[in-house]
Swiss-Prot record:
Pathway: Amino-acid biosynthesis; L-histidine biosynthesis; L-histidine from 5-phospho-alpha-D-ribose 1-diphosphate: step 6/9. GO terms for cellular component: cytoplasm. It holds the Pfam family IGPD. InterPro entries: IGPD_sf (IPR038494), ImidazoleglycerolP_deHydtase (IPR000807), ImidazoleglycerP_deHydtase_CS (IPR020565), Ribosomal_Su5_D2-typ_SF (IPR020568). This is Imidazoleglycerol-phosphate dehydratase. Transmembrane segments: none annotated. HAMAP family: HisB. It comes from Chlorobium limicola (strain DSM 245 / NBRC 103803 / 6330). The gene is hisB.
Amino acid sequence: MPEKLNTSARRATVTRTTKETDITATIDLDGSGTGNISSGVLFLDHMLTNFSRHSGIDITLDCKGDTEVDDHHSVEDIALVLGSAFLQSLGSKTGIQRYGWAMIPMDETLARCAVDLGGRSYCVFSAEFKRPAILGFSTEMVEHFFVSLSRTMQANIHLAIMEGKNTHHMIEAMFKAFAYAMKMAVAVTGKELPSTKGTL
């Protein structure tokens, strides 16, 4: 797949163009939590803006996709691009916390997330949503988003709803839990690579 990468400090820009989507995303791990999101899927815009604000990670994202067909291609490809941008912005990973975790309440909902940025792509997702879609965003794509993200980010992501009824609250709490887990995991807390293997 065509992909262009530019990195400096803890910042990366990734561009991916296919016959289904044209996406450019910039990640700044040491930003101020500013999200400029145009995904073509309104509810995903809302979720990624929330993620940016609560993680403190700046995200600029523009996606032109075939949403007249479905939201699947855009949501999946955005996750793949963001994962690549996260991985590139982490660089050698020297000094990072590596692990992060959070539990986030939102009214009746409680979401849990744990992240390992150790180079092992694996996602465990546990949630059932009553509504099939919100503002053009298919709720079945929430799991697919995080599975795709974990693949290109080379990260282990565990996400679960512990309690919840309202679909909006459940999805938003999951994105916020992921935000706080990532905020912890990407934090620079030392000078050594957080692995006994000598590589991540």
